[in-house]
Design a protein with these regions (language model features):
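Catalytic core of non-heme Fe(II) oxygenases with the double-stranded beta-helix
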Residues: 79-156, 161-164, 170-175
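Intrinsic structural disorder/low-complexity segments
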Residues: 13, 28, 47, 110-112, ...
Length: 186
């Protein structure tokens, strides 16, 4: 599977707070490749209550996202069975805000394991997220998880106020369950 999505059941309540948080924490020294404004890379470590709530939910989604984007959902599937579902951790997280004409150039997040984008705001005319040339419409409250090595971008926005919280996830290979590895070798 190229990507995995989940919808946050409290997105409509939390998103206005997240939008304000992103807009109030712009990093004036950096802009998005293609325009737009962004926060620094460690938004998830600032002790911001609304971001902490979102991150707690994202953390809970990561194990299932890892199974799905790895292509294996069965314990009999060797690839899905050999990684520790608790071995993933958000390493970077930042907010991005785009207005009309702003976009993101094609890029990827290698060498991270997975990346995500959570849609905070997508007014009419907001550009889709394009992952390996597949368009994914931004839907407020929806998160998209994908392998970090996949190329992605957005086209120029046709409206003001598109806002995302995005991030990169690392995997600690020291947490691989060798019990699972041995069980599948027999």
């Amino acid at each position: 599977m190229k990507f995995y999505t989940e919808d946050y059941w409290q997105g409509d309540v939390l998103n206005p707070y997240l939008y304000n948080t992103v807009c109030n924490h712009f990093n004036d020294e950096e802009t998005v490749m293609g325009g737009g404004r962004k926060t620094d890379w460690k938004l998830h470590t600032k002790g911001l209550k609304d971001v902490d709530i979102l991150i707690q939910w994202i953390d809970a989604c990561i194990p299932e996202a890892a199974i799905q984007v790895s292509g294996g959902g069965s314990s009999k599937d060797y690839g899905a069975a050999t990684f520790d579902r608790g071995g993933f951790k958000i390493n970077q997280c930042w907010g991005i805000h785009y207005n009309k004409g702003q976009y993101v150039t094609k890029h990827n997040h290698f060498p991270f394991a997975m990346s995500f984008n959570y849609c905070v705001s997508a007014p009419e005319g907001s550009s889709p997220f394009i992952l390996d040339e597949e368009e994914i419409e931004p839907i407020p409250g929806r998160i998209v998880f994908f392998h970090s090595h996949r190329n992605h971008y957005t086209l120029p926005n046709k409206s003001d106020g598109r806002c995302m919280i995005v991030g990169n996830i690392v995997y600690n290979p020291l947490t691989v369950s060798y019990t699972h590895l041995r069980a599948h070798e027999t």
